[in-house]
Design a protein with these regions (language model features):
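Short terminal hydrophobic/aromatic SLiMs and anchors at protein ends
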Residues: 3-4, 20-22
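Anionic-ligand binding patches
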Residues: 18, 24-29, 64-216
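Short loop/helix-cap segments at secondary-structure boundaries that form the rim of catalytic
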Residues: 40-43, 61, 83-84
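Cofactor-binding loop segments of dinucleotide-utilizing enzymes, especially the Rossmann-like FAD-
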Residues: 33, 54, 136
Length: 216
């Protein structure tokens, strides 16, 4: 499959001819099994026709920066799924939590979550989400969104209580901002939905620029 890249969106992109001239509504596939992303998409009037998680290796490359990782993995997810669904709009996203240049893992063990939260305690960190969209015409639209999040200093009681909740399981950086961890957040600069897993403003721009109707 041959792709053409579109990285910058302008006003003219919003007037994509498919938006007005499409005879049938193409399928929309979310290349992610994340229930959070499905819920976020519903806020802008989108219910995926199908959810197809991409089976890829998410291991960071040597010296890969957080921003680069989010962009690479989101595009790889979209391309992987689009290969078997060439007539659909395929949307993928990847969220990366970083302390400085250190990429924090998805917490699969309580020890992972404890280590991540220890690093986040009392300081600011960054959350990057790469989003990638491949259209039925094999066009590629990509964005990377950054949000700064500042935690309060966590005491032993905070940490023990949160770890016992199990909310951290499978979460990048070991926390979910939309859950109990909201009580740890002193400040946020940028997109809140980006930290949840899908930046809605930028995703809307991406979809509209590609000719996919939202808010329906």
């Amino acid at each position: 499959m041959k792709y053409s890249s579109v990285s910058q969106l302008g006003y003219r992109d919003l007037l994509h001819p498919w938006y007005d001239n499409a005879m049938t509504k193409p399928h929309f596939i979310l290349a992610s099994a994340s229930p959070r992303r499905i819920t976020l998409l519903s806020q802008i009037g989108i219910s995926p026709d199908n959810v197809v998680p991409a089976d890829i290796d998410e291991t960071p490359l040597a010296k890969e920066l957080p921003r680069q990782l989010g962009k690479r993995l989101s595009l790889l997810k979209a391309k992987t799924v689009a290969t078997s669904h060439p007539d659909a709009f395929v949307l993928a996203a990847d969220t990366v939590v970083a302390c400085g240049r250190r990429i924090l893992p998805k917490a699969n063990r309580v020890e992972d979550a404890e280590q991540c939260l220890g690093m986040l305690s009392g300081r600011s960190h960054r959350v990057f989400s790469g989003i990638a969209l491949i259209t039925p015409k094999s066009e590629i639209f990509t964005r990377i969104v950054e949000t700064s999040v500042t935690f309060k200093r966590l005491d032993k009681k905070d940490l023990a209580s949160y770890l016992s909740s199990g909310e951290w399981e499978g979460k990048a950086g070991g926390y979910a901002i939309q859950g109990l961890a909201a009580g740890f957040i002193r400040q946020i600069k940028g997109s809140y939905s980006n930290v949840v897993g899908l930046p809605l403003f930028e995703t809307t721009q991406l979809l509209q620029g590609a000719g996919f109707q939202v808010f329906k």
